[in-house]
Amino acid sequence: MSISDDISPVPPAPVSEPNAGQDAGQDAAPAHMAARAEALRDQLNYHSHRYYVLDDAEISDAEYDALFRELQDIEAEWPSLRTPDSPTHRVGDTVVAALETQAHTLRMYSLDNAFSAEEWDGFIQRMLRAEPDAPTAFWCDPKMDGLALEVIYENGVFTTALTRGDGEKGEIVTTAMRTVRNLPLRLHGEGPHPARLEVRGEVVITRAEFDALNAARRGAGEKLFANPRNAAAGSVRQLDASVTAGRPLRFLAYGVGQVVWPAETSDGAASAAQGPEARWATHGQVMAALADYGFGTPPDARRCETPAQVMAYYEDLGRRRSELPFDIDGVVAKLDDLSAQAALGYTARAPRWAIALKFPAHQATTRLEHIAIQVGRTGVLTPVAELAPVAVGGVTVSRATLHNEDEIRAKDLRVGDMVVVQRAGDVIPEVVRPLVDQRPASGLPEFEFPAECPVCHTPVRREPGEAAWRCVNVGCPAVVRQSIIHFVSKAGLDIQGVGRRWVELLVDRGKVTSPADLFGLDKQTLLAFERMGPKLAENFIAAFDTARTGATLNRLICALGIRHVGEQTARTLAAHFADLDALGAAQAETLQQLPDIGPEVAASIRAFFANEGNRALLERLRGVGLWPVRPVRPEADAAGAPGEGSGPLAGLRVLFTGSLTTLTRSDAERRAVAAGANILGSVSKKLDLLVVGDKPGSKLDKATKLGIRVLREQEFLDLLEGRGGDVPEDGDGAPGNEDEAPEVSADVPAAPEVLADAPAAISADASSGVAPGVSGGPDRADMTDRTVRTDSVDAPAMPRKKDQHSLL
């Protein structure tokens, strides 16, 4: 099946035979050999384009290989003839030491999402309010589920490839992308080409090629990829380009970034204009030009003249999504008129002229075989459904979080039930409901939540008003393991290069039983581990030293994992207490005088410092020199200065709860602070505004009882952008009450394969202190198993009601 509109590039002239008897020892390549190399490059690039982009090969593989080997031989004899656009770069003979980053010239924005027809209508209305005369024709294409990437061309030659990264800067993956067969190394077609062209798109793998890739890995005894997206991402981010070259990757272009045109056009007229709109009027024209330049483009893309046609396209594509060669999770609709795009501009995170219309979640039916219990770093016991493996939207799902006991009771889930499973937002596995009519006539027993921790067998406790049961033993092996992982994480001390798997390995081997042990590790101890080389061991020790000497008080407070104390509360505490001695001596009454600390948080802080084991840990940290005495520097943490400025949330005290779909919790808090808000850590009468995501839990109940105003996530974003008017009255727009979401969330498909020195995944055993069938905490790679190809369920028409956002 062709993956782009059929275009017919003019084939290069046939390659002539070389002259016999040429002296290969000359330093300078003879002119006729240089001409031959150029002809070979043109011929190979032409046939690669016909094969990989147009699916219309003109020569056999053997003929192509003969031309390719001939060019390799010429370049080996005369290296000066190897040009940047030579097809021989695609063999991937380069290894880079590490992936460096580079800033994008123009930011790569995210897209806002629409999950219902009403949200699509709301997007249109917001757009027309901002620009009443904007045309409403849209360019629509499938939302490819791959790795977003930017490829850069200077004077028609490919020079740089960057991952999307955080939108501001991305990782440089130029060497790997040179091996992607359908990516033009030199722009095709007649000029003039842009002097600089930034092309944006997705790196994808077809489902058929993904199945073949996993079959080969299975035969070789290698770990299987979870899904095509993870395979694509892991392949592009390889340090060894020869690995990338062996993967069936394709780059599909969906737009452009910066475009700089030559100073003069082909007819000699001066042209100082820059940007795509200097030569193209519509996005459709941009896509046609990219196809002419030699790029593959998303299949089934089209122009829709009205918003109603967009919805018809969305519903049609949803019904046919299983017929497409690639995984997709929705439709991207972009205003087709480029001048209207420029007039509408961007919000802080997304264009105002484009949106992603997401498909409803895939669903499937399977059996609930067991309910296992995970123990997290604060002792939370999280039930996890162990399922008979089932294909859901192209991924085999065998586990899904059940959040807490109340959710099990509310859904009446029982071991042995046939259940409906979905991937919310096509990503997060979720058990939707049991099929009660399929239970045996004799019935099934209700699930009994354990009365003791399955790891250390300490009695568990559930506090009034909370949804979670907790192990209260701070020495529980599972709690210790997860606490150390949190200690080194980005939310803790952010110890660079020391990831979750290394911590698990250190704990499992008994080398680390406390965060303080990390700072006593020496090179000899580290070198005893497989795949730990001298340089990596030195990097680890240097990272621990940097954390020990450079940690700020607020980071250490957060790293300690005090219950209810997150990043913002840690900043508040660090700004008011000189060191941990002063904080530990503070009485509850003193703590409650601080801006975001109520009785519950104050009691938790007091309980932490009263615990004998915690006091022993603090003394050990003091002994290794990890004892910051300075408050967080305002210039180093500007986001921590709450309540300042004149933004839309100026002076308001805000709290977030539930699972946010478009932002991380940290990003949401930073944006709220930038808008003038003060972030609180718990619900109290001091709170002005509660922002709720999915499964907001008991915080919503408390806020409702206290008459605190509530906003949905999208309403919060609208308010930040000046689109939402005033903060709504009490409870307006709040979703239905749900139990407190536990700290262990539903897991997503396995992360891309490890790129640098890192150990293989560590399985739980007796040495880890984790009971059989029980995890010492969430391993996001475990929730979704290996991918199998499956035909997806036809997507129904988008519902006409205002649904809560699914997790992405």
Swiss-Prot record:
It catalyses: NAD(+) + (deoxyribonucleotide)n-3'-hydroxyl + 5'-phospho-(deoxyribonucleotide)m = (deoxyribonucleotide)n+m + AMP + beta-nicotinamide D-nucleotide. Residues 18-30, 746-773 have a biased composition (Low complexity). It comes from Nitratidesulfovibrio vulgaris (strain DSM 19637 / Miyazaki F) (Desulfovibrio vulgaris). Residues 779-792 have a biased composition (Basic and acidic residues). DNA ligase that catalyzes the formation of phosphodiester linkages between 5'-phosphoryl and 3'-hydroxyl groups in double-stranded DNA using NAD as a coenzyme and as the energy source for the reaction. It is essential for DNA replication and repair of damaged DNA. CDD domains: BRCT_DNA_ligase_like (cd17748), LIGANc (cd00114). Its EC number is 6.5.1.2. This is DNA ligase. The lineage of its organism: Bacteria, Pseudomonadati, Thermodesulfobacteriota, Desulfovibrionia, Desulfovibrionales. Belongs to the NAD-dependent DNA ligase family. LigA subfamily.
